[in-house]
């Protein structure tokens, strides 16, 4: 029920990764990356399908060898989500996966080789109508840039990116996006700001090697949150030393928190104190697990007492305010006569949320049908 965020998106050109639009005002796409051995086709396919179930838009797959390229061909045949091939060192692998139907090629300027090799990749991408991501990383800058700057700096990352943007410009190839990732939040943020001011292409955001599930999520939320709030960014990936499924969940949570893109339930819950009238923490944890399958955007407030509960419920799709034995229930900001038994809170609230989601989905379907006529 909250209004969309007052964020003006940076204007950019548009490309397509498979059927997913990127840039020029398209919804910010959430990306992840497999961490299986690509040659283990079954494990990789299973992981990609798990990512699909939580709503991933694009998946990157590392293709380090020709054997992995052959495996990639089989993987591509078994999944629906667009796949980006992550290519380092051997440009010939890019040519092979292009032949096998890859949806985007990620190349690293720090190790892909000279301009002739890049030309070969570009010619192949043009032939198969495949976009490219220039993926600059603070940990693998070109040797001459490392020597020039001494350490990764925003200017160093920008120079690496612009060197390869200029090559693609000379080759008259404009179907690309760019990233300038670093593990340091401030380094990454400033690098992206500099790049956003220089080019019109879409930008892929990320804090590389951010860390484990908790610390990595915090770093990514700070860094990407800063950039997204400034309108910078067209796709994103949360890099975690964790299950890739968690990357997708955190990515959507960041977009949801900034009200840039809504998917699923935005839970608003108090941290609890001695005034709580029911188990708020247990209720929220249980509902987050039970309702992971819902994609209908809605705000659900779960507040343990009457101090802030009514106010939060007024601006929520579904709201609960703790009371003695029974708690108040709100729908679309209106207090209902029905009250929830505190001992049955989880089951009752789940039923109400699912019913509301079904109504909202049906309403949207009817609207679409009327427009089509």
UniProtKB/Swiss-Prot annotation:
Ribosomal protein as UniProt keyword: no
A Pfam family hit: GcpE
GO function terms (MF aspect): 4 iron, 4 sulfur cluster binding; 4-hydroxy-3-methylbut-2-en-1-yl diphosphate synthase activity (ferredoxin); 4-hydroxy-3-methylbut-2-enyl-diphosphate synthase activity (flavodoxin); iron ion binding
Pathway entry: Isoprenoid biosynthesis; isopentenyl diphosphate biosynthesis via DXP pathway; isopentenyl diphosphate from 1-deoxy-D-xylulose 5-phosphate: step 5/6
Cofactor: [4Fe-4S] cluster
Enzyme Commission code(s) on record: 1.17.7.3
Cofactor binding: number and manner: Binds 1 [4Fe-4S] cluster.
Job description of the protein: Converts 2C-methyl-D-erythritol 2,4-cyclodiphosphate (ME-2,4cPP) into 1-hydroxy-2-methyl-2-(E)-butenyl 4-diphosphate.
Protein name: 4-hydroxy-3-methylbut-2-en-1-yl diphosphate synthase (flavodoxin)
Naturally occurring in which organism (per UniProt): Pectobacterium atrosepticum (strain SCRI 1043 / ATCC BAA-672)
Organism placement in taxonomy: Bacteria, Pseudomonadati, Pseudomonadota, Gammaproteobacteria, Enterobacterales
């Amino acid at each position: 029920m909250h209004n969309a965020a007052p964020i003006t998106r940076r204007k950019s050109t548009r490309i397509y990764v498979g059927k997913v639009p990127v840039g020029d005002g398209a919804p910010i796409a959430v990306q992840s990356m497999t961490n299986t051995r690509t040659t283990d086709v079954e494990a990789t396919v299973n992981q990609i399908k798990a990512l699909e179930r939580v709503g991933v838009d694009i998946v990157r797959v590392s293709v380090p060898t020709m054997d992995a390229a052959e495996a990639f061909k089989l993987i591509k045949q078994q999944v629906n989500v667009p796949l980006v091939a992550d290519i380092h060192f051997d440009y010939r692998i890019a040519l092979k996966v292009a032949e096998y139907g890859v949806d985007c090629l990620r190349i690293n300027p720090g190790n892909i080789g000279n301009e002739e090799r890049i030309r070969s990749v570009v010619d192949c991408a043009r032939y198969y109508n495949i976009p490219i991501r220039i993926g600059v990383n603070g940990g693998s800058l070109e040797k001459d840039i490392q020597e020039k700057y001494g350490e990764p700096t925003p200017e160093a990352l920008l120079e690496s990116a612009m060197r390869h943007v200029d090559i693609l410009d000379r080759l008259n190839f404009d179907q690309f996006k760019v990233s300038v990732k670093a593990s340091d939040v401030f380094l990454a943020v400033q690098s992206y700001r500099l790049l956003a001011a220089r080019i019109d292409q879409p930008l892929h955001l990320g804090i590389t090697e951010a860390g484990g599930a908790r610390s990595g999520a915090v770093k990514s939320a700070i860094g990407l949150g800063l950039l997204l709030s400034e309108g910078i960014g067209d796709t994103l990936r949360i890099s975690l030393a964790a299950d890739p499924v968690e990357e997708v969940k955190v990515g959507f949570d960041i977009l949801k928190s900034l009200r840039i893109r809504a998917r699923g339930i935005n839970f608003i819950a108090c941290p609890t104190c001695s005034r709580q009238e029911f188990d708020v923490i247990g209720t929220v944890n249980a509902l987050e697990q039970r309702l992971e399958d819902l994609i209908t955007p809605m705000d659900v407030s779960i507040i343990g007492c009457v101090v802030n509960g009514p106010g939060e419920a007024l601006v929520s799709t579904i709201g609960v305010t703790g009371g003695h034995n029974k708690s108040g229930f709100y729908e679309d900001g209106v207090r209902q006569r029905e009250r929830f038994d505190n001992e049955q809170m989880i089951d009752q609230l789940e039923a109400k949320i699912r019913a509301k989601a079904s109504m909202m989905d049906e309403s949207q379907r009817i609207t679409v049908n009327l427009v089509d006529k």
